[in-house]
Amino acid sequence: MFDIEKFWQHFNDEMRARFNEVAYNAWFKNTKPIFYNKNTHELKILVQNPVAKGYWEKNLSSQLIQSAYGYAGIEILPVFQINENNDSPERIVTPEPRYAIQLQQEKRAHKQFTKNLKLNEKYTFDNFVQGEGNKLAAGAALAVADSPGSFYNPLFIFGGVGLGKTHLMQAIGHQMLAERPNAKVVYIQSETFVNDFINSIKNKTQDQFREKYRTCDLLLVDDIQFFAKKEGIQEEFFHTFETLYNDQKQIVMTSDRLPTEIPDLSERLVSRFTWGLQVEITPPDLETRIAILRRKAEAEGLVIDDNTLDYIASQVDTNIRELEGALVKVQAYATIERADINVNLAREALVDLKLVQKNRGLQISKIQEVVANYFQTSTAELKGKKRVRQIVVPRQIAMYLSRELTDASLPKIGQEFGGKDHTTVMHAYDKIDKQIKTDTEIKSAVFDLKQMIEH
């Protein structure tokens, strides 16, 4: 008799030996068999999300079949089912396989090439701290690194400043070079592409420019929103994209917003940017922030107890960059005071932190509250569906301010306003943006509200 539980343990032991800890946790930790049909040999397996399902089907199912045949002489038929009980299935994905052992020769070649690419050596998958806000992006990035040009192409990672988009993007480059040291990887800021293009025209070196960008195996473009309103650049990048995509070369882009939100981005680029997968990174939750601080402290050789890490993490809920900045501030304060780092010292060091933080990420509820009080309505009305002017105008202003004062994407803002579509938020933003220039009453209200929210 085929014992599913024992076989699954056997298969997991095989995979644990093959993959490193990061990889194993990515695809096996939250995956389990839920049903086996002894007549058809169909094995139903529960996975966490669409990315995990796609990766198992493409990369792991054959290994599962081979393992079952070797274990029990049975040719199983794996069927993968997404866990519908997952609270946020679209966000729960973890990284994927990296082989633990690499030849020293490959490592040397990797390091030499990486230096020329200007990739940050710290930006690897092993150094990436995962949480609820970035699991899907991390899993997608790992899937791309494992099967470039075929899994999600292009991969479009979007989200606010300092949340780890560049880290994930460069980690893809690091992994490709670790596995294929001779691969041609090009990592650039979008401004670099613009400057290179302009210089190629000026110096009549367009052929060299196109050779650089159209013959690579992996193109990583950071902050693609910089292409907004640049028609000539968009035209050139379109042809670069077409060439790489048709040659099945991987393209990865980051942005602070969705392709549809980038102003004056050509329709054909918007279309192509959405061919693959678009994944959002959101601000880290408390547990993730503590994990980030703990890893940072260990890297710096700092001894900080859990209570102090918890306190620092509770003071910064915006992004990783500001979170690590808070730790640096605490460290500097401890050095100046010649004191050990503890909760009291951290409290003194960060006493003015809240005064200088910008309104971002998770503060849409505050904006709704201030706007509701200003217009003598309720947050429930702002989130509701009433179309009377007394509600519609405050709602649109609240959406406008949410877009202006936070790093939240349009879909996220729509979600905070009763699950409205992102196009509704876009319409509200555009309308208020225009009215500010022509309607003194609206302009005055927006100005007053900004002052109230920011102070």
UniProtKB/Swiss-Prot annotation:
InterPro entries: AAA+_ATPase, Chromosome_initiator_DnaA, Chromosome_initiator_DnaA-like, Chromosome_initiator_DnaA_CS, DnaA_C, DnaA_dom, DnaA_N_sf, P-loop_NTPase. GO terms for molecular function: ATP binding; ATP hydrolysis activity; DNA replication origin binding; lipid binding. It is found in: Cytoplasm. Its main location: cytoplasm. ATP binds at residues 162, 164-166. Residues 74-117 are annotated as: Domain II. Residues 335-455 are annotated as: Domain IV, binds dsDNA. SUPFAM superfamilies: P-loop containing nucleoside triphosphate hydrolases, TrpR-like. Keywords: ATP-binding, Cytoplasm, DNA replication, DNA-binding, Lipid-binding, Nucleotide-binding. GO terms for biological process: DNA replication initiation; regulation of DNA replication. Residues 118-334 are annotated as: Domain III, AAA+ region. Belongs to the DnaA family. HAMAP family: DnaA_bact (MF_00377). NCBIfam families: DnaA. Oligomerizes as a right-handed, spiral filament on DNA at oriC. This is Chromosomal replication initiator protein DnaA. It comes from Lactobacillus helveticus (strain DPC 4571). The lineage of its organism: Bacteria, Bacillati, Bacillota, Bacilli, Lactobacillales.
